[in-house]
Amino acid sequence: MLSSSGHAIRRGITTSAALSNKHAFIVGAARTPIGSFRSSLSSVTAPELASVAIKAALERGAVKPSSIQEVFLGQVCQANAGQAPARQAALGAGLDLSVAVTTVNKVCSSGLKAIILAAQQIQTGHQDFAIGGGMESMSQVPFYVQRGEIPYGGFQVIDGIVKDGLTDAYDKVHMGNCGEKTSKEMGITRKDQDEYAINSYKKSAKAWENGNIGPEVVPVNVKSKKGVTIVDKDEEFTKVNFDKFTSLRTVFQKDGTITAANASTLNDGAAAVIVASQEAVSEQSLKPLARILAYGDAATHPLDFAVAPTLMFPKILERAGVKQSDVAQWEVNEAFSCVPLAFIKKLGVDPSLVNPHGGAVSIGHPIGMSGARLITHLVHTLKSGQIGVAAICNGGGGSSGMVIQKL
């Protein structure tokens, strides 16, 4: 067990602006709808979902598939997805056989870290076109049986989602218990989290109604024996029951604050972001959507993962050359409602600028995809000249963040 003493833990922070004179531009971004657990997208594999997102990002950015030189895709639960899942997605999207592909696992930060890696390849001059994104089919994550002799009394079946995605590897507790620790230490109540989550659901519904989310989404054709079903909308925000919201029992601790309603859900989806150099943008007469100003990672004690995103700021903003007051929109992943609430409380961020169109609580949290969804959403909702920030925590006490400017 790791010590929770502030003196015993080294808080690591890494940030970066451009690593050379090269700028990294986002020229295309798209995502699939997010399906509920074992629901509309459950028969589609994670690589297949990512292929759909990559194709859409290429088409919308007017980028030729043959231009892509490297791909980074996040995925957390890779068991039974087949060899090199990101490679499957790249080839499934029609990219060249010569494209270099890497699957990234930084738990919930995987999708955003993949975009950071793509940006670094552009900034250092290694590539002119790269894709960063994330994918997850939590519906298809298998159960595990330990290899070896079967003991007397049978064997235990292990849930792959819980084991590899939702359990702290050091203290052997569910991530929700870590969230409860943060809630208690920061005075974030059950009422605070319920109110936040209810607003998240309402904001997501309104955003879909007003056309704030639709433009970033590409429909997925789901084949079955009955034919083809077109899934073109997020599912999770439509399934809320506000009448039962505040009466649900807490999930992780008897006297706790986190419930099934004010936490994120298990979901399926994928997102892809195309990053290009200034030279490539000029040569192909592309219209860039945004410029990547800075990014970074931070880490603290694994039990305190919920506050890890706050450790990156204001350092990343300083590297980007902007002030906190310059940020028009903060996309902070809602693994649990206490995460954005802690972010707002610690940094003094204007709550109205945080997740204005809802977040993972109401939209869904396919864990390998979510970081890429944050950037995809910012690219499509910021107005020209505005600054946007994406921040996401991850198991093990880590986090990743990025600052972009809409062009």
Swiss-Prot record:
Entry-linked Gene3D superfamilies: 3.40.47.10
Enzyme nomenclature, EC number: 2.3.1.-
UniProt-annotated binding residues for K(+): 201, 260-261, 263, 361
SUPFAM superfamilies: Thiolase-like
Primary enzyme class: transferase
Compartments, record wording: Mitochondrion
UniProt entry keywords in alphabetical sequence: Acyltransferase, Metal-binding, Mitochondrion, Potassium, Transferase, Transit peptide
Gene knockout outcome: Animals have a shortened lifespan and exhibit early behavioral decline characterized by the premature onset of uncoordinated locomotion and paralysis.
MF GO annotations: acetyl-CoA C-acetyltransferase activity; metal ion binding
Role according to the record: Plays a role in ketone body metabolism. Has an effect on lysosome related organelles (LRO) function, in a pathway with serotonin. Acts downstream of sir-2.1 to regulate aging and stress resistance.
NCBIfam families to which the protein is assigned, alphabetical: AcCoA-C-Actrans
Family: Belongs to the thiolase-like superfamily. Thiolase family.
Protein name per Swiss-Prot or TrEMBL: Acetyl-CoA acetyltransferase homolog, mitochondrial
Species whose genome carries this gene: Caenorhabditis elegans
